[in-house]
């Protein structure tokens, strides 16, 4: 089977790390062992520097909304061109913690950046490059934030007010409904239920890929 790019998406506290581990388990059960891992923003030395600037700013100066968008896309294209595409070309599968859908939801939804502008920027920077499968872990923002707070100190994005995350979730759900490559998983269930749902979704998708 040709190598694929699989992405885990969702709000803070949705359980992306656990989901990633579950996806990897299923891939290995299907004989897929050459797997590269990425995270966004970040994933390369340059992109990690941009991640730190995005998260913390410099000497109290935080990026404006438009600067935030451009920093995210700079980090993303660096990761895609230097890590993801080369990995896929050599036959490895790539499992990513976030990708472009995050920007479309957080900046296009949460921040209120013009959605046509966001789509245009995506197409200009990434061309036709898209994940083969995206698992969107959906849960009420208040639940995710409670989980995030329980983990410890919150970053700049995690400290946003609840309405920001409600707008972000609404955009996530809107985009997921429009794209057959995005599978929505109810992440408000118990850990065992979420894990079982992810295993089922990924296994069914792999069977479809094998039969294609």
From Swiss-Prot:
Identify the Pfam families for this entry.
Thymidylate_kin
Q: What is its EC number?
A: 2.7.4.9
The EC category is transferase
Instruction: Kindly state which reaction or reactions the protein catalyses.
Output: dTMP + ATP = dTDP + ADP
Q: Where does ATP bind?
A: 10-17
**SUPFAM superfamilies membership:** P-loop containing nucleoside triphosphate hydrolases (SSF52540)
Could you state one GO cellular component term attached to this entry?
Answer: cytosol
Query: Listed GO molecular functions?
Result: ATP binding; dTMP kinase activity
Q: Which GO terms describe its biological process?
A: dTDP biosynthetic process; dTTP biosynthetic process; dUDP biosynthetic process
**Superkingdom of this entry's organism?**
Bacteria
- What keywords tag this UniProt record? ATP-binding, Kinase, Nucleotide biosynthesis, Nucleotide-binding, Transferase
Q: What does this protein do?
A: Phosphorylation of dTMP to form dTDP in both de novo and salvage pathways of dTTP synthesis.
Q: What family does the database annotate?
A: Belongs to the thymidylate kinase family.
User: What's this protein's name?
Assistant: Thymidylate kinase
Q: Which classification does the entry list for the species?
A: Bacteria, Pseudomonadati, Pseudomonadota, Gammaproteobacteria, Enterobacterales
């Amino acid at each position: 089977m040709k190598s694929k790019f699989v992405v885990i998406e969702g709000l803070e506290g949705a359980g992306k790390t656990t989901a990633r581990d579950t996806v990897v388990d299923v891939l290995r059960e299907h004989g897929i062992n050459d797997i590269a891992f990425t995270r966004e923003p970040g994933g390369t030395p340059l992109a990690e520097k941009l991640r730190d600037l995005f998260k913390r700013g410099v000497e109290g100066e935080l990026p404006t909304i438009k600067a935030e968008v451009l920093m995210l896309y700079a980090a993303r294209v660096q990761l895609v061109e230097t890590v993801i595409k080369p990995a896929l070309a050599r036959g490895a599968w790539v499992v990513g913690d976030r990708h472009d859908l995050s920007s479309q939801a957080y900046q296009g939804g949460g921040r209120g950046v013009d959605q046509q502008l966001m789509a245009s920027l995506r197409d200009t920077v990434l061309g036709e490059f898209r994940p083969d499968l995206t698992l969107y872990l959906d849960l009420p923002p208040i639940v995710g934030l409670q989980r995030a707070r329980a983990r410890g100190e919150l970053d700049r994005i995690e400290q946003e007010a609840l309405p920001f995350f409600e707008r972000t979730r609404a955009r996530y759900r809107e985009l997921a409904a429009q794209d057959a490559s995005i599978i929505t998983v109810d992440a408000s269930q118990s850990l065992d239920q979420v894990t079982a749902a992810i295993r089922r979704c990924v296994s069914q998708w792999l069977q479809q890929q094998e039969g294609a």
